[in-house]
Design a protein with these regions (language model features):
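A short alpha-helix capping/helix-coil boundary motif
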Residues: 1-3, 31, 78-79
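Short, low-complexity N-terminal intrinsically disordered segments enriched in polar/charged residues
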Residues: 1-23, 27, 140-144
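Soluble or luminal CAZymes and related metallo-dependent hydrolases
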Residues: 5, 47, 95
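Exposed alpha-helical structural elements
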Residues: 9, 24, 47, 121, ...
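A beta-strand edge to alpha-helix "cap/lid" segment located at domain peripheries
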Residues: 58-63, 70-144
């Protein structure tokens, strides 16, 4: 499935991010897409699909709300809020994460780069590490 507008296809894909939505990945990302986030750099749509399948396996829900965007002729930037629940984090309670995505595209997305706070996504929600991360953040806030 190739949608005419890669921006529309991208946003539609992430509005409800789950195992079923992954079927649309080939219509959105080019075969040789480069994907990066704070943890990974992935080359190729097959490897990206494997990464997303692994991620979705641990999520009980995930959706993105797009808050703002800047669209260029062949690139775009999105500010988003992710709403997710993860089996191993906070007893599967609903969580939120703010982030930004930068994409480059032609007919499909050729490059996708995510920016977000890994501590807010994961570390703050782990039993021992979480309290240490929150303590450090609060001390930094007080000193600035």
């Amino acid at each position: 499935m190739l949608l005419k507008d890669p921006i529309l296809a991208f946003k539609q894909f992430y509005r409800q991010f789950d195992q079923q939505s992954l079927n649309a990945l080939d219509g959105i990302y080019s075969e040789d897409v480069t994907f990066s986030d704070p943890v990974h750099i992935i080359q190729g749509s097959d490897k990206l699909k494997q990464y997303f399948e692994s991620m979705c396996g641990n999520l009980t829900s995930c959706r993105f709300d797009f808050i703002d965007e800047v669209i260029g002729e062949n690139d775009a930037c999105f500010k988003w809020e992710m709403h997710y629940s993860h089996r191993s984090l906070k007893s599967n309670a609903p969580l939120r994460l703010m982030g930004t995505t930068f994409i480059k595209y032609s007919e499909k997305i050729d490059a996708h780069e995510d920016f977000y706070d890994m501590g807010a996504m994961l570390y703050e929600h782990l039993p021992l590490i979480g309290s240490a991360v929150r303590l450090v953040k609060s001390r930094i806030k007080k000193s600035s």
